Amino acid sequence: MTMKYFCSVMIAIALVGCTATPPPTQKAQQSKVSPTRTLDMEALCKAQAAQRYNTGAQKIAVTGFEQFQGSYEMRGNTFRKESFVCSFDADGQFLHLSMR
């Protein structure tokens, strides 16, 4: 009798556990960066790339801007088609320049 009761309770617990709803998925918050801050980041990226490639900032083209969960990246190239990526933190502070 105890075995029947025990099996019934275990089956009931298993069924209750299967019907539990999964927690909602979390989505990353998208913060907006101001247009003036974006322009400042672009100017800083161009200046850093111009210094690295020993050319003028006017010969540097920024071709892309991507926002990630905790950082930003600006892609660009020189007039000689040399690619680079500028990385910024979540506050828009320059981190580093990567040559590609």
UniProtKB/Swiss-Prot annotation:
Signal peptide residue numbers: 1-17
InterPro entries noted in UniProt: YsaB-like (IPR025728)
GO cellular component, one term: plasma membrane
Keyword Amino-acid biosynthesis: no
Annotated compartments: Cell membrane
Principal subcellular localization: membrane
Residues with a covalently attached lipid (S-diacylglycerol cysteine): 18
The keyword Cell membrane is assigned to this record: yes
Keywords: Cell membrane, Lipoprotein, Membrane, Palmitate, Signal
Pfam families assigned to the protein according to its UniProt record, in alphabetical order: YsaB
N-palmitoyl cysteine: lipidated positions: 18
Membrane topology per record: Lipid-anchor
Name of the molecule in the record: Uncharacterized lipoprotein YsaB
Species per Swiss-Prot/TrEMBL record: Salmonella paratyphi A (strain ATCC 9150 / SARB42)
Gene symbol of the encoding locus: ysaB
